[in-house]
Amino acid sequence: MKNIVVTPMTFEPVYEQDAEIVERKGIGHPDTICDYLAEELSVALSKLYIERFGAIMHHNVDKALLVGGEANPVFGGGEVISPIEIYLVGRALKEYKGVTIPAEELAIEVAREWLKDNIRNLDPDTHVIIKPRIKPGSKDLVDLFLRFQQKGEVPLANDTSFGVGFAPLDDLERIVFETEQLLNSPSFKENHPYVGEDIKVMGVRIKDKVRITIACAFVSKYVENIQDYLEKKEHVRRIVEEMAQGLTQRQVEVFINTADDPERESVYITVTGTSAEQGDDGQVGRGNRVNGLITPYRPMSLEAAAGKNPVSHIGKIYNVVANVIADRVVSEIEEVEEAYCYLVSQIGKPINEPQVCDVKVRTKKDLKSLEEEIKRIAQEELEKMPETWKKFLNREYAVA
């Protein structure tokens, strides 16, 4: 259990502080679209590498940029005037031992398929232009990757970087997460097709008062006029408020599209269900962390997990594993109320040998009596780390 440290939390719990802020960007937000397209490309490349070479090869396709298009939404319809442009950028092994990998063609195919499956009112063939820009990686990093892949050894860290995680979610975090999940669930969309996928939820708590502000792109073809829009918006607001109130004892207020000006009929309607059609651009790494939230009152890493290779890229693996360790410590040790986990690597060293694994816990019990069990959990997850890539390929771990 070398380099595993267990320390007490010496600061006030976030949920007991006077103020707290939590955010989540939904699946149709331009930043989240970029995250998912980058990750889907990494998964597709990984599977193709395994098929062709028997192992995942070097790649990092973690740079994506969405340039918003132009659209003219009107009640009852509208049109996309100029398409969205999406640049998928990164590094990937494109040839090995005479075998070529069609990385850019794969990027286009994967992106169109994901958009078709997830943004219902967006036509990936006419509303979007996919522009892949994928080049080979640097020789030293490719060689580092091949060094352990060819020998079947524990992957070596491709960077000196860190990951962090925490558990459990508090009530504001759960409300923000569950609000977006509800509004973007298949059952909700079936009953409320006018709600688009571009949903951003901001939760603010001041003492025991919670304010949830939702930016929700309504789909114009399902909204007849301004009165219909206002009635539908109020209906959604009440549903969210009822759900949110069931998750907390605190007082909850819900607001939707607060920039609307009904008198001028200037409201948040879109043709496609995403502001990417005109109002907003997007980029990998500007949205949710691997637990699906943006939590400025908690420890966070600025690393973008999406699109990074799942075998040795610390910015991806350590953030997920840190959350797993924190979650297991809280769920398996009854006396632990809260846990934070911090992991840091050293480039070129085995990924399961971090420079430090610091687990901070909040407990009313003597920490010494729990230390061995906490270290055991952390060690178990470190030992599993060389197999973590399988769960990314099976989409068991989220990156946004």
From Swiss-Prot:
Recorded GO MF terms:
ATP binding; magnesium ion binding; methionine adenosyltransferase activity
Matching entries from InterPro entries are given as: AdoMet_synthase_2_family, AdoMet_synthase_3, S-AdoMet_synthetase_arc
Query: What's its EC?
Result: 2.5.1.6
Q: Where, by residue number, does ATP bind? A: 135-140
Q: Which Gene3D superfamilies match?
A: 3.30.300.10, S-adenosylmethionine synthetase, C-terminal domain (3.30.300.280)
* One annotated GO biological process: S-adenosylmethionine biosynthetic process
Write out the similarity annotation.
Belongs to the AdoMet synthase 2 family.
Job description of the protein: Catalyzes the formation of S-adenosylmethionine from methionine and ATP.
- Which protein, by its recorded name, is this? Probable S-adenosylmethionine synthase
| Species for this entry | Aquifex aeolicus (strain VF5)
